[in-house]
């Protein structure tokens, strides 16, 4: 049995990951910014009599992470597995979004994960044992409007995770990156709504891609099972695309030169919708204009 700390467990991937590890017999320390939002997790853990302990930890706060880690280690011993799942999204054009939005997303998605890793690395290094799993996204390998704040944060997380993997392999600590595609979470469904009218057509187009993909939703439990598999597995691999569209999205981007990719995303709506339909079999056109 391992002791597992998971951030961002109030819903979605984090909640399902907490349940998956607990069902597998591990002790789960489920953290979130506001434990008042833990009702679903608490009820499911209680109903199944699962070893899940819920506590407050705000990954945006040095004080919260430091004190949380100290308390956990005193009460539960060393942490064997860290799953950095806490994350937020924001969509919009770079011109229209306030700078504070970029800072806020980066604070949670990148610095939040980094903060937790730095807090736990000394004990893992000294014990020469441990596993860190960072939840990124296919967005960590693809960049396109209108998700620049989110994508920038995931690119940063991918970079620091790859660097950390090289540093910690010497100490027998595994680092892995999970790259989900479009998963049925509240975060994904928020991106469905293009919101206010914008001169940037990409904002509306991307929302329609999410609408089309979520017609056949992929449960967060699929990602949770992959995270558990990585943690319990003997064979180490750095990156793990998850979900039926994850690898295809990455392969789609890889087939374009940088200039071709920019031109596609800067092009007119008809060309963009046609290319997505050709390559993915998805009609992402808005219903009012679909053929």
Regions found by a protein language model. Give the residues of each.
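Conserved glycine-rich cofactor-binding loop
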Residues: 10-12
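Substrate-binding pocket helix/loop in short-chain dehydrogenase/reductase
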Residues: 93-94, 101-103
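SDR active-site lid
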Residues: 170-237
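Active-site helix of classical SDR
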Residues: 117, 153
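Conserved glycine-rich Rossmann-like NAD(P)H-binding loop of the short-chain dehydrogenase/reductase
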Residues: 24-40
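The beta1-alpha1 cofactor-binding region of Rossmann-like NAD(H)/NADP(H)-dependent oxidoreductases
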Residues: 56-67, 99
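Residue(s) in the substrate-gating loop at a strand-loop-helix junction
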Residues: 137
């Amino acid at each position: 049995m391992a002791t597992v700390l998971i951030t961002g467990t109030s819903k979605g991937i984090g909640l399902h990951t907490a349940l998956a590890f607990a069902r597998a017999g591990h002790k789960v320390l489920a953290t979130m910014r506001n434990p008042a939002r833990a009702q679903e997790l608490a009820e499911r853990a209680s109903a199944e009599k699962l070893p899940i302990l819920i506590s407050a930890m705000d990954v945006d706060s040095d004080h919260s992470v430091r004190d949380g880690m100290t308390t956990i280690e005193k009460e539960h011993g060393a942490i064997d597995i860290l799953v950095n799942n806490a994350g937020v999204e924001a969509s919009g054009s770079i011109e229209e979004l306030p700078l504070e939005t970029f800072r806020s997303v980066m604070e949670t998605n990148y610095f939040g994960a980094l903060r937790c890793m730095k807090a736990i690395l000394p004990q893992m290094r000294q014990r020469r044992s441990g596993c860190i799993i960072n939840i990124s996204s296919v967005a960590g390998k693809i960049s396109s409007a209108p998700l620049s704040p989110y994508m920038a944060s995931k690119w940063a997380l991918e970079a620091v995770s790859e660097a950390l993997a090289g540093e910690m392999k010497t100490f027998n600590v595994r680092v892995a990156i999970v790259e989900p595609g479009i998963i049925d979470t509240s975060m994904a469904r928020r991106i469905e709504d293009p919101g206010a009218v914008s001169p940037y057509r990409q904002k509306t187009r991307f929302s329609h891609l999410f609408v089309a993909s979520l017609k056949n939703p992929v449960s967060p439990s699929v990602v949770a099972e992959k995270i558990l598999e990585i943690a319990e597995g003997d064979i180490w691999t750095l990156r793990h695309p998850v979900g039926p569209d994850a690898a295809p999205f990455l392969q789609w981007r890889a087939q374009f030169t940088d200039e071709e990719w920019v031109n596609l995303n800067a092009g007119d709506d008809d060309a963009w919708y046609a290319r997505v339909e050709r390559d993915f079999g998805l009609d992402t056109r808005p219903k009012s204009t679909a053929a």
